[in-house]
Amino acid sequence: MLVSLFLFVPFNRTTGNEQQIFFEIDLLAPASCPLTIYNVFSNTIVEELPKIGIGINETDFSGWAHIANRTWNYPGPYPIPPYDKGGYDIFLIGLGWWESWNPASLYNSSLMPPNGDNFYQYANPLFDSTAHNYSHAWLNNDRLHWAQELQAILYEDLPTITLFYPKDLYPHHVALEGWNSPFWMMTKESMENWSIPGKSTFSYALPAEFEYFFVLDSDHYDGVWLQQIYNALLTLDPLANNNYTSRLATSYSSSDGLTYTIQINPSAVWADGVTLNASDVEFTYKLLLTPEFRYKDYDYWTKYLTNDSIVINNEFELTITFSEGCVFPEDFLTIDLVPKHIWEGVPYGNFSAQAKDWAEKDPSKIIGAGPYMLAEYNKSANFIHLIKNPYFKDWFGSAPKFNDIYFYYITTKSEALNALASGEIDMVDTQYAIRVDEVPSGTAYTLVNTESYYEMAINNYHPIIGTGEHCPIAGKQSAKYVRRAINHIVPREVIKNAWGAYLLEDGIVPCPQNSPFFDSSLQPFNYNLTKAKHYMELAGYIFQSTSPTPSISLTITPIVALMGAVVIFLRFRKRQKKPT
């Protein structure tokens, strides 16, 4: 999924005797919607780069088709050249990982276009070998070790310059308890522990109409309520440092990272009281492996699994064997299960349509093993009503705190906030893009680490900032010095102060902050003009001027619009050839 918000920003290129320009580059960025963080960024960087001798020739805010043809879909011949020859120099963009961080899919040297998504054209044998170890590590401590090694390499090499880690803002009832926020946006959190003292009903505002009703074919908006109905073998658990823990499975084990034996809780039942067993798991997984169902990650799943991969050992035990090692095999076990006795016989291509029909006419069919079940979908009034799953406590051990949960489609931000202020709504979705100063008094808000980051992607085949062959002291080390200089000239504090809508944290490496493997020991590249000039000089660029260096004195109109989220969400299991 891609949401893009950019605006063309005019600039004046500084030349003449005021500043010494060693070379010029071009900036590339999407131009979809106005008033984003890159509006602020572009105003600052075009003033800062000339201070270290880098001029801006052109800032190209273009549509995705144009951008794709200069980056991941470049038609050749390869490598992707600089901007003036049809490629790019620096590309301003945001990336996000839904769940599991897999940098090899972006930076492995074998995956440069046309073979993959490494449009950075970054090549480092040490990175490749470390990424191999990471992707084949199936013990969590080993993954953590290799993940931090990868971040150390990216921190040193800077194939891309990570600008910021944005946070999501959720306004909510001041007494809300039990919300573990990191996975809510990814529709990976169940609400059985949510509570507000003295309240038995919870209401949530969404900015989109209800459209998807089958849990294995849904988006974020419908995913948040469908997630309360269904359940998986494993889950990502914020209370376990965002690692995998058992849900419907009582245990899972592997001796080689390829074959997993899974024990299912024998007490688990569906919301109609029917026993949940291994045949339901087999049914769900074979559904996703059936081309007629058109599962969005079908290509990735069929790379590692076939129908023969799932073997039922007994009613509550099965074995799943992967055809080859993959990053995070547990991720396959976080898929929500659907009841075979409800869905068996429905044509594979008709699941989504059937789910919508049942939601409107017979909601008792929309059941899973989650804490809640569908009581009503009111199409005319635009709300979803969930009630407790009466069997959930019997196998899970505790009952959901709320008796009823409502999800309302509320069209505008102001309406949603007014409803929160009046007590009609208990929580407002982050997609309304609400600023801190808009949160009603008497309510609260939570800022949540996200799965995304903003960056300046570098063309590592650019002769100066990539290969360094055209630097006065030619070589890759000089290119690295130039990239370090650029990183130190980004005025992150100025940009954060000018943005004023969301809390941004300084970007360090291209790994999201909500990853359990994020290395918080790495230090940001603080703004330091002296250090930036020093790195330029190490690359052979000698500054002649001895005049005082101008300080940052930018006047930027505070942004009052959406938090841009110019983010391509990357599922490591599926190449996304163009944003949608």
Indicate residue ranges for each PLM-predicted region.
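N-terminal lobe/hinge region of extracytoplasmic solute-binding protein
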Residues: A205-S255, K286, I367
